[in-house]
A protein has these predicted regions:
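A short alpha-helix/helix-coil micro-patch that ends at or immediately precedes a cysteine
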Residues: 47-86
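Surface-exposed patches in mature extracellular/periplasmic domains of secreted proteins
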Residues: 72-90, 170-178, 231
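Short, low-complexity, Pro/Ser/Thr/Gly-rich segments in the mature regions of secreted, periplasmic
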Residues: 212-231
């Protein structure tokens, strides 16, 4: 039996335990929910594409996302395939696949994209996932009038959605204690950057850092691996 969960992203801690031993949140990171994906099962997850357009446009970005994720998840690999696979719109994708689509305003709102995941009800490990990327991200100067910055932001944004597809959530928190959890309200890294998974966006806007998880994100990925032993 499977269950699905989705996280929507716009681009314009005390730890919790899901089951004994599992950690689902910490300073600057959290999983989507302690009741959804709590671990990654060892082996390979394959990234496929919903269309030739998605494959052409998203392959270089998702290769970066996959590589940057895999180096932080020992025993769990993410491989980008050339295979075309229609995204399942009701229910879950095939086991151990993450399907990427390129759509104009997939949620009907300017700049909104989405990442989502399915998990096994038996042990809450990741079953499959998807990313739906807004074509507007690739319009000239969409994120910035600076071409390099624009590219860096696309890298960060794609990895952000990929993070949702494997179980990472937004780590936003009411830091100023005003009773509201606001956009960009996330703990900061030592270099003052926001976690990559911060909503609506975060990450390092540099040539070397773009598309990478920040130091605050990394414990979340490590938790997804470590939690599997406590399933």
């Amino acid at each position: 039996v499977l269950a699905a969960v989705a996280v929507t992203t716009a681009f314009t801690a005390t730890a919790e335990a899901a089951t004994p031993g599992q950690v689902t949140a910490g300073s600057g990171w959290k999983l989507i929910s302690p009741d959804s994906v709590t671990s990654l099962s060892p082996g390979t997850y394959t990234i496929q594409f919903d269309s030739t357009a998605a494959r052409t446009k998203l392959t270089p970005y998702l290769k970066l996302s996959a590589a940057n994720t895999a180096k932080l998840t020992p025993g769990v690999k993410f491989v980008v395939s050339t295979t075309l696979q229609k995204r399942v719109t009701t229910g879950c994708q095939k086991a151990r696949t993450i399907v990427a689509s390129l759509e104009y305003r997939p949620l009907g709102k300017k700049g909104y994209s989405q990442g989502g995941a399915c998990y096994s009800l038996a042990d809450h490990s990741l079953w499959s996932g998807y990313v739906r990327i807004d074509t507007e991200w690739f319009y000239p100067k969409w994120f910035s009038t600076n071409a390099s910055t624009n590219t860096y932001r696309i890298r960060n944004s794609t990895t952000h959605e990929f993070g949702h597809a494997i179980g990472l959530g937004h780590p936003n928190k009411d830091l100023n204690h005003d009773g509201k959890v606001a956009d960009y309200e996330c703990p900061l890294n030592k270099d003052k950057s926001r976690p990559l998974m911060c909503s609506p966006n975060g990450g390092m806007v540099t040539s070397a850092g773009a598309g990478n998880y920040t130091p605050l994100d990394i414990p979340g990925l490590k938790a997804l691996v470590a939690n599997y032993q406590y399933r």
